[in-house]
C-alpha cells in the first residue's frame, strides 16, 4: 500500500499533525512503510483558476507553475490519501482548501490509479466551531468521497480538551485506524455508472449508489431526471446496506 499524507496545519506539532503521526505509526506497525508526506504550509500553491486545461489532452496535470506538480505524482501513485487539517472559521484551513480545489487533474487518472481505487482519511481538530464547523467539513469529504467512489474514514478531535498528546484514547483511535488497513486491498472496479457521459466505474453497487446521490443535487437540474431513474433502480435492490439506503432516502422518500 502506498500512502500520501498531506498535513495542512501551519503548526508542525499541532493536534492534526500529532494525530496524523499516530495514524502513520499504526500503519507502519502492519508493514505500511511506503508513506510520502508533504506539509502544505511549506508549499507554494496558487488558487485554481478554473481554466480546465488539466481536463484536456495531454492530461499532464496542472498548468500553473507552482508546487502542486510536486505532489501530483505521489497522489496518482497513492492507494491511501490522508488529509490532516484544522477547522478555521467553520471549515478546513485554507492550505487544504486550496489543494482540494486543485484536484481537478485527478479526474484524468487512468483506471489503475483513478479515484475509485483510493481510500480517503480525513483527520481534523476544531475548537470554537463545535459542533457546526467540523460537521460542515466532514460533510464535504463525505460528499467528495461518495461522488468519487472512495472509501472514507474520519478522525475528529475537540481541542477544547487541550493538546491531543494528552488524550490517550484519541491517540489510540488514530493508531487503531492505521492498523485497520492491514487487510486493505485495492478495489476492483466492476460497476459502471449508467448515466450518459459519466464513465465512472465503481467497486460495487454501494459506491455507485453514493455517487449517484452525491451528484444528483438541485444544482444538477439538467441531469436530475436521468440520475433519479438510476437511483430508483438501485434503491430497489437488497444489495445495499441500511446506511446507503438511508442516504438514498434523503433524495428518494420511498427508497428507505
Could you tell me what each predicted segment is?
Residues 8, 40, 124-127, 157:
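Cofactor-binding loop segments of dinucleotide-utilizing enzymes, especially the Rossmann-like FAD-
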Residues 34-39, 149-158:
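Short beta-strand elements in bilobed, periplasmic/extracellular small-molecule ligand-binding domains
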Amino acid at each position: 500500500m502506498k500512502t500520501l499524507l498531506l498535513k495542512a496545519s501551519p503548526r508542525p506539532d499541532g493536534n492534526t499533525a500529532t494525530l496524523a503521526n499516530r495514524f502513520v505509526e499504526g500503519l507502519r506497525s502492519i508493514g505500511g512503510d511506503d508513506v510520502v508526506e508533504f506539509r502544505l504550509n511549506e508549499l507554494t500553491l496558487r488558487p485554481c483558476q478554473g481554466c480546465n486545461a488539466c481536463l484536456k489532452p495531454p492530461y499532464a496535470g496542472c498548468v500553473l507553475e507552482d508546487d502542486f506538480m510536486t505532489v501530483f505524482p505521489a497522489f496518482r501513485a497513492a492507494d491511501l490519501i490522508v488529509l490532516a487539517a484544522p477547522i478555521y472559521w467553520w471549515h478546513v484551513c485554507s492550505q487544504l482548501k486550496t489543494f482540494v480545489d486543485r484536484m481537478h487533474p485527478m479526474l484524468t487518472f487512468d483506471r489503475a490509479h483513478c479515484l475509485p481505487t483510493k481510500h480517503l482519511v480525513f483527520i481534523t481538530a476544531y475548537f470554537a466551531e463545535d459542533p457546526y464547523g467540523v460537521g460542515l467539513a466532514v460533510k464535504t469529504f463525505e460528499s467528495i468521497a461518495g461522488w468519487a467512489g472512495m472509501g472514507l474514514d474520519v478522525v475528529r478531535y475537540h481541542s477544547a480538551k487541550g493538546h491531543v498528546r494528552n488524550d490517550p484514547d484519541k491517540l489510540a483511535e488514530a493508531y487503531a485506524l492505521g492498523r485497520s488497513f492491514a487487510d486493505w486491498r485495492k478495489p476492483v472496479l466492476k460497476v459502471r455508472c449508467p448515466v450518459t457521459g459519466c464513465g465512472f466505474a465503481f467497486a460495487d453497487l454501494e459506491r455507485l449508489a453514493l455517487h449517484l446521490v452525491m451528484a444528483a443535487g438541485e444544482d444538477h437540474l439538467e441531469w436530475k431526471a436521468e440520475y433519479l431513474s438510476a437511483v430508483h433502480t438501485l434503491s430497489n435492490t437488497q444489495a445495499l446496506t441500511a446506511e446507503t439506503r438511508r442516504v438514498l432516502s434523503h433524495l428518494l422518500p420511498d427508497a428507505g
